[in-house]
Every structure is written in C-alpha cells, then in structure tokens.
Amino acid sequence: MMHFSFRHTSLADIDFYIECFRNDEFQYMLYHNDPINVNNLERYIVKNDKDIKFVGSIIDESGNLKDVGFAHFYFKEENAYTYVGGIHPKYFNHGYGVYASIAMLSLIYDLMPNIKISTGIYKHNLRSLKSDLAIGFTIIKETNEKWILELTKENFNNNFVGRVKLKIKYQLSNI
C-alpha cells in the first residue's frame, strides 16, 4: 500500500519552494499568471486567505521518502477552487502522479465534499489530459493553448478512482 501524507504549507517549506523556483520551466508552468518570485515567496506561502496549500509526501512501506510534491487550491468563488500542483523537480515523476492526485483530491473531498475543482492542461500535455479524464475531470472549455477541466465529487467517485483508493492510504498531518 502506498502512503501519502499531506500538510498545510508553512515557512518550514521555504527551501523546498526555492528549489522549485530554480527550474524555469516548472516556475512558468505553475505560476506564469501570478506575480510570485523568490523575493516574495515567504509571504506567498503563509498568506492563505481562502486558498488551500498543501505539501505532500509519498512514503513507501519501509518508511522511505519516495516523492515530494505540492497542491494548491486557489479560491475562485463559493464552493469552487482552481487547482495547480506539481512534483518537486529534484524527485520528478517516479510514476506516482495519478496516485498522488487521487490521494490529494480524496482528502480535499473528505474535507469539503461540495466543492468543484478546475484546472488547465496545455494541449501538448496529452499524458496529463488522459490521467485527469480518468480521474473524472471533464473538459468545460478549450482555448488555443489549453483545455480547462472541472471535477465534481460525483465524477470523482468512478470505478478507476475506487480501484486506486484500495491501493493507497492518505492522511492530513500536523507535522
């Protein structure tokens, strides 16, 4: 069984975020619409308002850290959030992306069952589109450069997600 541990971001994560920001492509992909850089990163990490920001760890059966990532849910309107997330470039993608997404989204829906979550996927990233559609996202809009997808709890509770949930354990940690 794969173990996922999530916690709210704090200033203890500053080095993790600085490492992420050293990767130009990674920084652009996640934050090109936000005026965030290393200079105001501390304020960004601790300023949550209605946003929800998590750092997640994937731990194997022996207790070894396998992957580190983050997921940010930006408040749009009541019961609606926009989601961005990523894996730390240093540990980039051991093949756990779908498992991590399902663990994170399961936790979010446990905490806030009525929310809708949207995200955008660039058209060159067909692999991400395929996995998000399997999770239950549906395409609600298309632009020249990307698809906009939305997820509800009803669509998330599908057979594929159910099978994956049997293979994972997730928790919210205070650490």
Language model region names:
Residues 20, 29, 44-47, 167:
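Residues that form generic nucleotide/phosphate-binding pockets
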Residues 25-44:
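Conserved GNAT-fold acetyl-CoA-binding loop/helix
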Residues 1-16, 20-23, 53, 60-175:
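Acyl-donor (CoA/ACP) binding surface of acyl/acetyltransferases
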Residues 45-57:
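A short helix-loop-beta-strand connector motif used in the catalytic cores of GNAT acetyltransferases and
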